[in-house]
From Swiss-Prot:
<comment type="similarity">
    <text>Belongs to the prokaryotic/mitochondrial release factor family.</text>
</comment>
<keyword id="KW-0694">RNA-binding</keyword>
<comment type="function">
    <text>Involved in the light- and stress-dependent regulation of stability of 3' processed petB transcripts, thus regulating cytochrome b6 accumulation, a rate-limiting step in photosynthetic electron transport. May be recruited to specifically protect petB transcripts against 3'-5' exonucleolytic attack by masking the 3' ends. Does not function as release factor.</text>
</comment>
<dbReference type="GO" id="GO:0009507">
    <property type="term" value="C:chloroplast"/>
</dbReference>
<keyword id="KW-0341">Growth regulation</keyword>
<comment type="subunit">
    <text>Interacts with PDE338.</text>
</comment>
<dbReference type="Pfam" id="PF00472">
    <property type="entry name" value="RF-1"/>
</dbReference>
<dbReference type="Pfam" id="PF03462">
    <property type="entry name" value="PCRF"/>
</dbReference>
<dbReference type="InterPro" id="IPR045853">
    <property type="entry name" value="Pep_chain_release_fac_I_sf"/>
</dbReference>
<dbReference type="GO" id="GO:0009570">
    <property type="term" value="C:chloroplast stroma"/>
</dbReference>
<dbReference type="GO" id="GO:0009658">
    <property type="term" value="P:chloroplast organization"/>
</dbReference>
<dbReference type="GO" id="GO:0003730">
    <property type="term" value="F:mRNA 3'-UTR binding"/>
</dbReference>
<keyword id="KW-0934">Plastid</keyword>
<keyword id="KW-0150">Chloroplast</keyword>
<protein>
    <recommendedName>
        <fullName>Peptide chain release factor PrfB3, chloroplastic</fullName>
    </recommendedName>
</protein>
<dbReference type="GO" id="GO:0003747">
    <property type="term" value="F:translation release factor activity"/>
</dbReference>
<dbReference type="GO" id="GO:0043488">
    <property type="term" value="P:regulation of mRNA stability"/>
</dbReference>
Length: 406
């Protein structure tokens, strides 16, 4: 009897394990099925969001590009006719101006045609996708095309706003730490990184031509020069000139700063005027200070008191040429600010230094960014330091256009 009970107990245990195993298997299958369903839902939601973003860009391109292309082509034809009736040999300077305008117009036409093609390609992929004729990877391709379209649209729109002298040139940005302290130099390094990331977001290259740190471990930046070798960089960045202040603590007034200056980086031709050799003092700081780059060249313009330098080239000769070009660019900007036609008429006592506060970056509490010139506030410090400064630049450009219109 005992044996039967024991045997029955064993049988029951085997049955229970089997039932439990079966239930566990059914639960696992259901859980797996549920996870697959959720993955499908998430993918569909992502696809819906992707489609909407692409459609928004395509719609904007369809509304904007045809009229813009028609206008640019009309202007191109008119400039070609002007060139036919103009003797290019009579006035070389005027000829260069006409040819440059014609080249710019041709470039705008090609850019708008490319924009239309990419928008049509993205639209076709969306239409095929709605018929389940393509896979998910092609939507990613359409999204990449829509990003190109969006960048091209933004570039074209900005090119119409940035019509001031030198706006279409590249930019040379000179950034200096507000003090020799470690915190200030680390903050300056963050500012440098912010502008590099901004250029990357635009799909453009920005090169740190030279960088110097006075800290023993070489961290941080005491001064740096960034070269933006793409069209309209100067127009984009002109509003960044001034003091960029990091507020570390509102209670103790702890803060540090970096000063930004902007000069044109001429993409087509260097400034076409001569500076008298007698007005220049050329020096090589590395002879006095071993911490400074060996090939650094500084050029001081005696009449204006302006000094520019270069240390990023391979030798002193190349650095001297670059420093002189930077000096000429700075003198042209000052002459424009003072509304004089000749750099020799610059009043050294009225040169505007970049001392005005451009922006405050609050790292405690709300962690926000406040633009002091335009009043714009952005409640996302991290995003701005990651290079998302488009809204800030746009606000400066709009303010400049409003002032010019008065």
């Amino acid at each position: 009897m005992a044996a039967k009970i024991i045997g029955g107990c064993c049988s029951w245990r085997r049955f229970y394990r089997k039932r439990t195993s079966s239930r566990f298997l059914i639960f696992s299958v259901r859980a797996s099925s549920s996870m697959d369903d959720m993955d499908t839902v998430y993918k569909q939601l992502g696809l819906f969001s992707l489609k909407k973003k692409i459609k928004d860009v395509v719609l904007k391109a369809e509304m904007f590009a045809p009229d813009a292309l028609e206008l640019e082509e009309e202007q191109w034809i008119k400039q070609e006719e002007t060139m036919r009736y103009f003797d290019l040999w009579d006035d070389p300077a005027k000829s260069d101006e006409i040819l440059l305008k014609l080249a710019d117009r041709a470039k705008a036409v090609d850019s708008l045609k490319d924009l239309k093609y990419k928008a049509e390609e993205a639209k076709l992929i969306i239409q095929l996708g709605e018929m389940d004729a393509i896979d998910y990877s092609l939507f990613e391709q359409a999204y990449d095309s829509s990003l190109d379209v969006s960048r091209s649209l933004h570039h074209y729109e900005m090119s119409k706003l940035l019509r001031d002298q030198y706006d279409a040139e590249g930019a040379c940005m000179i950034i200096k730490s507000g003090s020799p302290g470690a915190k200030s130099q680390i903050w300056t390094e963050q500012v440098v990184s912010m502008y590099i990331k901004w250029a990357e977001r635009l799909g453009q290259n920005a090169r740190v031509a030279e960088k110097c740190s006075l800290l023993s471990n070489k961290s941080g930046v005491s001064s740096a020069t960034i070269e933006f070798e793409f069209e309209f960089a100067y127009g984009y960045l002109l509003g960044e000139r001034g003091v960029h202040r990091l507020i570390i603590s509102s209670t103790s007034n702890e803060e540090c700063s970096a000063t930004v200056d902007i000069i044109p980086l001429f993409l087509r031709a260097s400034p076409d005027f001569e500076v008298k050799e007698g007005d220049l003092i050329v020096s090589y700081p590395a002879k006095e200070d071993h911490k400074i780059a060996e090939n650094m060249v500084c050029i001081h313009h005696i009449p204006s008191g302006v000094t520019l330098q270069s240390s990023g080239e391979r030798n002193r000769f190349a650095n001297r040429i670059k420093a002189l070009n930077r000096l000429k660019a700075k003198l042209l900007v000052i002459a424009k600010e003072q509304k004089v036609s000749d750099v020799n008429k610059i009043d050294s006592k009225n040169i505007l230094e970049p001392r005005e506060e451009t922006r405050s970056y609050v790292s405690k509490g709300h962690k926000m960014v406040v633009d002091r010139k335009t009043g714009l506030e952005i409640l996302d410090l991290k995003s701005v330091l990651d290079g998302n400064i488009g809204p800030l630049l746009g606000a400066h450009i709009s303010m400049r256009r409003s002032i010019d219109a008065i």
